[in-house]
Amino acid sequence: MGSLVEFCGEVRRETQKAYLVFDGAHETWLPKSMIKSERVVASSIKDDRIFEIPEWLAREKGIV
């Protein structure tokens, strides 16, 4: 398995297969099948979550 990257963003929309996530500057779709873990940011008023995704996907989506 390749390297993983943590990515924090607000879930703006959800479908059966993906989340539309806003990182403060850009929106991007994250396929649920590629998310290795996710956790809710406890102090968040919005639906902020921390996702762990493959580094190659983060690069492809312009996250890193």
Each language-model region and where it sits:
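Catalytic phosphate/metal-binding cores of nucleic-acid and nucleotide-processing enzymes, i.e., regions
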Residues: 1-64
